[in-house]
Amino acid sequence: YFAQHAGEWDTIRSMQVAEEEVERAILGLMKNRRPGHLLDVGTGTGRMAAVLGAGASRITALDRSPEMLRIARTRLAGSPVPVELMQGDFAALPLGANSVDSIVMHQVLHYASAPDLVIAEAARVLRGGGHLLIVDFAPHDREELRRDAAHARLGFSDGQMRGWFAASGIILESTEALSGGALTVKLWLGRRR
């Protein structure tokens, strides 16, 4: 899907706040938290791994698409920390239990038909005390994103996230909303018990 529809990203991006503002908010939330071994789920071009990776001890960048992993490989080639690129699915992460310190899912969860299971799978690989950061959309009614951009979900509420986090043993520590267009970007940061 992503290789065939790359041109549509500009349309989606125009519906939300500038990505630079999202990145500033992400860095602000993670400012006092050491990423350790960082897992970037749905790495795409590797941008989030690059943004958060400077403070990491190691980066695992995971994506289903071999084409996206090739792009990420180029972007992350000069990383100051070891990077492993891995093909895999967010519903069945190819990592052992308690194996990573931080996980970021940036604009990924809305592709999940069962987001609760994706969060539970993230919790499985996250070490106790580790952080899960999900960046996605608040609830919206842009049905064309289902049709044109393969979104399985039209955003998430704080209540949904709080429930899914709690069911997976993750304490929701912080939420942030960034408005600036038809879509509101939300950041949910949790810590595994």
Question: Model-predicted segments: where are they?
Answer:
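C-terminal alpha-helical "lid/dimerization" subdomain adjacent to the S-adenosyl-L-methionine
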Residues: 131-188
